[in-house]
Swiss-Prot record:
It is an enzyme of class 2 (transferase). Transmembrane segments: none annotated. The gene is mnmA. This is tRNA-specific 2-thiouridylase MnmA. It is found in: Cytoplasm. PANTHER family: MITOCHONDRIAL TRNA-SPECIFIC 2-THIOURIDYLASE 1 (PTHR11933:SF5), TRNA 5-METHYLAMINOMETHYL-2-THIOURIDYLATE -METHYLTRANSFERASE (PTHR11933). NCBIfam families: PRK00143.1, trmU. InterPro entries: MnmA-like, MnmA-like_C, MnmA-like_central, MnmA-like_central_sf, Rossmann-like_a/b/a_fold. The record marks 128, 345 as: Interaction with tRNA.
Length: 374
């Protein structure tokens, strides 16, 4: 068996079951393990998460149980500057951002990775459900986690070769149920703790209320394509394309079907609504993306076929990708029209099990017509 005792791995510990088991497995494999809790949000704010203190206590309990040193590091400034400001800027543009993608790129695998290297780390490890494999040429490939329901490569799609080469994902080859079972067998303090949901580091608070602390909401009309006013919206930033909940308008209309958000117009502060889950305005034939990035350094061909997803836990769909000359922009054409393609979200490319990378969706089109700004 390899002697791992000289290899230092710094584990990002959140106080959840996944990162707890990550630390346990590495410790059992003989690595020199250090646990680090990242404090990325000021929870003294009256609307902030009040769970950071509890989470850190859980990290301390687990670290003591498995016998590893642990520390807390404060990345509030980095998080605010690199993730939260971006998040607000996207909402101001009427888009729906994905802060988790940015948080992984800028905090967990940049600020945290840099900090870990200062502690003499050879690798960092997290509880993400993803896998890394190095080929015979030393190129690191990121593969989906085998638990289809938990695979998190969508959120890791902006990571670089340099970041992946220094990263371990011990849970990537496991099902979530196995991870829970390991935690319970080991009697870890977090074994029965429920998974966190909600925005990266902001937790599960009322999102609408939270956002209104930072961005002024401006009410306006909810209008059909024919110009009929159906009601008032609370502020365009609170709505996303394809959304049904929270509109406060029943069936009626021509078809009695539920109403969905089909577009926003920032200039007139109008929210467009249409009836039916399969409303034609919700279907795009292609999208344009920017900030396109691939996990391997080898240049990609300018045109290629692969599969893609443009939201977490969505099944992949077959697409054709055309890259710009410099490779940072892409036109992604779907083999069949796709529903509720949302500007601000990530589009992520796959080749079988491998996550190739991705970009941020700027615009969605139905044939030649731009959608969502009806």
């Amino acid at each position: 068996m390899a002697d791992n005792s000289k290899t230092r791995v710094v584990v990002g510990m959140s106080g959840g079951v996944d990162s707890s088991v990550t630390a346990l497995l590495l410790k059992e494999q003989g690595y020199d393990v250090i646990g680090i809790f990242m404090k990325n949000w000021d929870d003294t704010d009256e609307n902030g998460v009040c769970t950071a203190t509890e989470d850190y206590k859980d990290v301390a309990k687990v670290a003591d149980q498995i016998g590893i040193p642990y520390y807390s590091v404060n990345f509030e400034k980095e998080y605010w500057d690199r993730v939260f400001e971006y998040f607000l800027a996207e909402y101001r543009l009427g888009r729906t951002p994905n802060p988790d993608v940015m948080c992984n790129k800028e905090i967990k695998f940049k600020a945290f990775l840099d900090y870990a290297m200062q502690l003499g780390a050879d690798y960092v490890a997290t509880g993400h459900y993803a896998q890394v494999e190095t080929d015979e040429n030393g190129v690191v490939h990121m593969l989906r986690g085998i638990d289809n329901n938990k695979d998190q490569t969508y959120f890791l799609s902006q990571l670089s070769q340099a970041q992946l080469a220094k990263t371990m994902f011990p849970l990537g080859g496991m099902e979530k149920s196995e991870v829970r079972a390991i935690a319970e067998r080991a009697g870890l303090a977090t074994a029965k703790k429920k998974d966190s949901t909600g925005v990266c580091f902001i937790g599960e608070k009322n999102f609408k209320e939270f956002l209104s602390n930072y961005l002024p909401a401006k009410k306006g009309n909810m209008v059909t394509e024919d110009g009929e006013i159906k009601g008032q919206h609370d502020g365009l930033m609170y709505y996303t394309i394809g959304q049904r909940q929270g509109l406060g308008i029943g069936g009626g209309g021509k078809t009695q079907e539920p109403w969905f958000v089909i577009g926003k117009d920032l200039t007139t502060n109008t929210l467009y609504v249409g009836q039916g889950f399969h409303h034609e305005k919700l279907y795009a034939t292609h999208l344009e993306a920017s900030e396109v990035h691939f996990t391997v350094d080898t240049p990609m061909p300018k045109e290629f076929d692969c599969t893609a997803k443009f939201r977490y836990r969505q099944a992949d769909i077959p697409v054709h990708v055309s890259l710009s000359e410099d490779g940072t922009k892409a036109t992604v054409t779907f083999k069949e029209p796709a529903r509720a393609v949302t500007p601000g979200q990530a589009v992520v490319f796959y080749d079988g099990m491998e996550c190739l990378g991705g970009g941020l969706i700027d615009r969605a089109y139905q044939d030649e017509k731009e959608l969502q700004y009806v």
